[in-house]
């Protein structure tokens, strides 16, 4: 059982303009409802002081945790050398599989022997490419560990995401709670039966999925892939972050 919070699909490199969500089979026991929210309404409803601070400080998303505590047992200079080699290995073999720019950093969350892949600094607000209107364009509701720890989450530690200010300082819990409340106040559940298709504007509409039990089969097709002018929030169409972690590990 895993709750997928509100998110857009994009990276600092690409963003899909639209998506078609298709239901082939609803959950056979219960749950699994698809839900959406209007990014313009979220932007409008957020406390202006919160928006101002997040916009000025920007945000960064940690996407992958590699716990390498075994290296901590090495003596003296061997430890530092091993950490450097581990960073180099991950940078050359794993990071290229992502169509994203990551910085590999040790110990951001206080665990000295944890190597994290952290996205570039990005804005929590974007302007729609056609209308020019501002909208909340941030995966905080889905990727903040503070929120994930307070709802059903089946993601293993290696894929446990988190979100920080642009300088990698912690975002206060009260700010995350406020964003969570505004997001959830704007959620609209979309019950779908087999054969239903939902078209969404990815620049304006965030989407997520409730917990479920039983078998469930949905799919999504992205179109209008283009370069993104504004740094985003967590995963391009079909990327490893949202589709590996949400689909293969927890069942999107």
Describe the predicted segments one by one.
Residues 2-6, 14-197, 203-252:
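Active-site environment of non-heme Fe oxygenases that use a 2-His-1-carboxylate facial triad
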Residues 10:
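Conserved donor-binding loop and adjoining core beta-sheet/short helix segment
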């Amino acid at each position: 059982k895993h709750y997928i919070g509100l998110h857009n699909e994009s990276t600092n490199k690409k963003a899909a303009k639209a998506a078609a969500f298709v239901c082939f089979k609803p959950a056979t026991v219960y749950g699994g409802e698809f839900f959406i929210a209007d990014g313009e309404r979220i932007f409008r409803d957020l406390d202006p002081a919160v928006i101002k601070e997040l916009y000025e400080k920007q945000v960064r998303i940690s996407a992958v945790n590699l716990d390498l505590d075994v290296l901590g047992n090495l003596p003296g200079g061997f430890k530092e050398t091993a950490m450097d080699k581990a960073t180099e290995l991950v940078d050359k073999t794993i990071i290229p599989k992502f169509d994203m720019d990551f910085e590999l950093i040790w110990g951001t969350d206080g665990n000295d022997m944890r190597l994290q892949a952290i996205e570039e600094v990005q804005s929590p607000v974007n302007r729609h490419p056609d209308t020019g209107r501002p909208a909340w364009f941030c995966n905080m509701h889905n990727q903040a560990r503070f929120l994930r720890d307070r709802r059903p989450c089946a993601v293993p530690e290696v894929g446990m995401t988190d979100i920080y200010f642009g300088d990698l300082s912690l975002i206060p819990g009260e700010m995350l709670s406020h964003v969570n409340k505004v997001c959830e106040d704007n959620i609209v559940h979309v019950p779908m039966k087999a054969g239903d298709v939902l078209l969404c504007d990815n620049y304006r509409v965030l989407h997520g999925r409730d917990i479920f039990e039983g078998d469930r089969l949905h799919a999504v097709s992205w179109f209008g892939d283009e370069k993104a002018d504004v740094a985003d929030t967590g995963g391009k169409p079909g990327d490893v972050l949202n589709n590996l972690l949400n689909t293969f590990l927890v069942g999107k």
